[in-house]
Structure formats: C-alpha cells, structure tokens
C-alpha cells in the first residue's frame, strides 16, 4: 500500500456518513489491542475555539518537556496535520503502516465504522506506538457520542466557547448543545469551562456535580487585553504578563486564558508545567487558517469561522485590526449552516463578495450563495473555481483588504491558489 492508496481507503465511500455512538470505535480499538488505554488525555469539546485551544495546550505541554500528541480536525493542507506529535505531522510512511494495521479490523466489522472513527483509531494507535506522555484530543462533533469519547477519565476535560451549531445533531437549544459537550466529563476528572452562557453553564455545573468533577470556570476579569497588531496580540492573564500571541484574532486571548487555566489546573494534579513553559508555548504556537494573514499589504486574510458564533468574533477582529476599512470577501459556506445570520454580520463590512463552492458535498453552490448575498443589497459574483475566486477577489480588492472565510474546508485550496497567484 502507498500513501495515495491509504488516503483512498480512509476516504472510501463505505465509511461515509455521521453515525453517533461509541460501540463501533470500541470494537475497532479492541481489535487493535485498546491502544487508548495506554495513553493519558486532555479532552477538548466546544463550539468554537477547540482547535486553537488544543494547539495552545499542546504547544505549552511540549515546552514543558512532554511528548505530546495532538489530534484535530479538519485539516487545512494535508490530511497528516490531523495527527501530530510535538508539532510534527505523522509521516506518510507511518500513516501507511497504520492503515495496513487498521484495515483488517475495520473490514471485518459488520456495523461498518465511519471515516472519523477510523481516523480516531489511527490516531490512538500512532500515539500509543510512539509512546506519547499526553495527548490533546479534540472532539469531532458534540461530545457524548463522539468517537473520541471512548477514553477513560482525562487528565482535564476542557469546554471551549459554546454557541448554536450542529443543531440537527445536538439539539435546538444551548442547553442541548451544552449537554452534548458535557458528555466528555467523566467521574472525578478536572473540568475547565470557558463559560459565559448562563443556560449552558447551568448544564455543565450540574453534570460536574453529578460526576464529582472539580469545575473551574475561566475568570476573564483577570484578562487584560489592549488590542494588537497584524503580527501578534499582547495580553496579561492572572499574573502572566505581556504575552505575545502570534494568533492575531481578537478572540484568541480568551482562548489562551482558557488554555492557561486548564494547564494550571493540571499542574495542581501533578503535571510539571512551569509558567515559563506556558509563556513559551503560547508565544511559539502555530495554528493555520484562523484569522491568518497571508499577506500584509494589501492585506489578504484567511479565517475558518464557519457559524454565526464564530463569524461574530471574526467580524470584531476585522474591525479591531482594520478600523474603518471595508473588505472584499471571498466566501464559501456549508448549506447546513445559519447562512443568513453569517451574511448579516459580514454585509456591513463588505465592498463586494466573491463566492466559490468548497470541495465538499455540504457546500452551498457559489451561485446560490451569491443570490443570498444580493438579498442583503450587496454586490456578489460567483466564481467557477476557488483559483478563479481568489484571483477575482484580489483584483477587486486592489489596494484594500481581502478576507477569505466561511468554512475551514476551502482554507487549503485558498492558501495554495493565493501562493500561486502571488508567485505569478
């Protein structure tokens, strides 16, 4: 088997679909010797900020001297990004070996696993074989029935900012969504929650009480944040002063405060994480595709916000970093998202929109999205391809800023198309 064949196997149509439940993952992992039972975890659930928070925690734990696995989704440029150790993506040849190990077990299952369940098994196997001391594990969707939730009590369960998303799968209210995320809380494990949403906080507090889990809610009154530049945001949090965070979204200091709080809780439970490692980890973290500046002047930004809750944070960041400026937006949005709410947030900042169709069946067709946008009185045109869309947005932007956003699923293609365009 080569890398292309391994990828074909992982993405094969027979695994397609979303089927909640843990039985298949347990069956698959049992056939592989239960690698997850050899590992210790930080488990991260939430609506927005999961990936950024997970990346920050992994970076800090690595700076503290630990061998750290990081499991995230989706990827931006290459699949291998989803499974990393100490900031290094899984090598192609290792991935091929793992697929060869997982394939017989998956093929033998009557209730076929989903693609995400197969990837979870690959990650667990790799982290165990490579003897990771701690794995930062990002939930795929929800919590309770997500395949990552096969693990026993984590070293820390982290719940990031909550908002309305995936309501079809998780339920129509914030309380429903909080209940799904709170599914990662296990008996007696420390829990750190972003908080700030009363109807969700009630649910998380109740579950913690039921599970005898010690809950810490982030004290954002201790976060001092004066703004930032296009290179870094600077903040103080609870005694850690003048941190220069290279993730420049205005929402990132709050994610960092969550990560810091969780790391300090872990320290009280025996993990050796000095403040100096937290600072180093935060100041060297890399997390592409989240309010990422691909070019300074004229500015070209790439952002992964893909629901109204995330879009609100991105719009605030655009106002903070580019006061008084209007944007050409390059947009693709999944058809199952709150499209109108997202567009209503963007419209006041827009000079013009260029729409494209991301390479996923869930994407709203570019022309349909353009029609939606025109309903807001904005000028919008659909491009035939992501490459054409990037070129057109840059042309329309002229000397002004361009921002590509609406889904993480086109981030890699946008980044590559922009690099080609600039290269000429």
Residue ranges: model-predicted function:
Residues 1-40, 168:
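Positively charged, low-complexity intrinsically disordered leader regions
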Residues 22, 26-37, 63-152, 170, ...:
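ATP-dependent carboxylate-amine ligase catalytic core
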Residues 37-38, 134-137, 145-158, 162-163, ...:
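Nucleotide phosphate-binding/pyrophosphate-handling subdomain across enzymes
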Residues 44, 52-69:
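A conserved segment at the C-terminal end of the G1
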Residues 110-111, 118, 131-138, 154-242, ...:
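Acidic, Mg2+-coordinating active-site environments of NTP-dependent enzymes
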Residues 194-216, 230-231, 299-302, 308, ...:
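C-terminal helical cap/extension that packs against the catalytic core
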Residues 408-424:
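Glycine/aspartate-rich loop-and-adjacent alpha/beta segment that forms the canonical ThDP
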